[in-house]
Amino acid sequence: MVIPGMKIICAYPVNLDALYDLGEERISRFIQSADPSGIKSEMKGSIRSREDLISSLLYCIQHGSGAEILVESLQLAEEIEASFPWSFRLGGNAGIMANLLAELGARPILNAPALEPRLAALLHPGVGIPVSGRLMQPSLAAERPDLSSEVLHFVFQFKESDRIPSPQGPISAAKDNRFIATYDPVNTRMVSNQDFDAYCQDHIQEIDGAILSGFHLAPRDRYREIFPPRIEQIRSWKEANPNIYIHVEMGSFQSQKIARHFLRLLEKADSLGLNEDELETATAEYSAIGSSPVSSTVLSTVLSTARPKMSQWQERVQKAAGLREHLGIFRVSVHTRDYILSIMEEGKITAKEELLSLQKGADAAAALAATGSAKGMPPNEVNPRGLEAKREFCRQGAEAAGVGRGAFHKRDGLVVSLMPSLLAREPRITVGLGDTATAATFYKELQAIKRDRI
């Protein structure tokens, strides 16, 4: 049974992404224009200079990790923009997810306080922008002068084995990934306009879900004033409509201190999503305050091993389970390059429905990487590391049930699910894969929840 036109709030960040595929000659000139004594392969808390940008970029390349870091000044942002030949595409977690949800048949309600014509042209016409109590197509909403302001994020994409020069010698990329340098006074403040706030509050009873992100963009010196209004907004939605299904994406925070503050405010959310790097930050948070991972029967079975130490996927299951218990929420999911896993309570969704939802997300992300479109044909090859993790998962006991490409384990009120990714050998896109997987998974989950209520 198809649930037509589900209304889903998408907030908060939407912007233009300026993309650059790293090329040795151009990046060499940029590095040569900086002070070599200020360049070291290390992650900076923010970007105050060319040297900070290069140091953080080299760190991500060397470790194959992704990150998003704030650029501190408009002047530096203009220097970065002038230094590379950029291509432009839709960016911002909320914008990417709203577009995909509209393609899937939902009716997304997008917060877009900085909507100018070039950005509006990249949004699906099925995305609704609240204006004066009604939803308008993006192209029409962009004609309003109070919504017009251009926002750019600089995305440096790199591929495995790319070689980049540095003052300490060439550095080779460990994995495909991206580094994002952001100067964005709108999304970093998590701004929402009055029309969006009023529409959501007035129509909350008819809204089925909300998928929220952008908390990681808050500056170090302002997060304590930025978070409370947004968390209060989530609380008001949940109290007015207890059936609304709310998923929050964590993002790459500038510091563990900000991450700790954010996680303590999440009791009204149903679900939290993270990538593998963000999981490390989040679990450092609960470890730091003395919470320990759960030791339920289902987890002790899943994590049993004859090896001297647990496999990486088992460690991530343990950390995700501990985080879910610490937060007291329904579900935690972790999307990695090799697989997507989730830990959830039984009740809202069956184990099979969750696994099919994860497969929907993994397939959409793989299709986007391989073809440039989430609705394209996904590749056939299963990620070998993800497949091996699934096989180990199924070897943990008879309770692990293989369903299609993935598997789940259900016991004592908890469900652990693992879905291997598909492998795009020559990816066309590396940005927005996590958002795509998250939105497609969320849509499938919400369909299952709605079916159960009918």
Language model: regions and residue ranges:
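Ribokinase/PfkB-type carbohydrate-kinase core domain
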Residues: 1-431, 435-436, 442-454
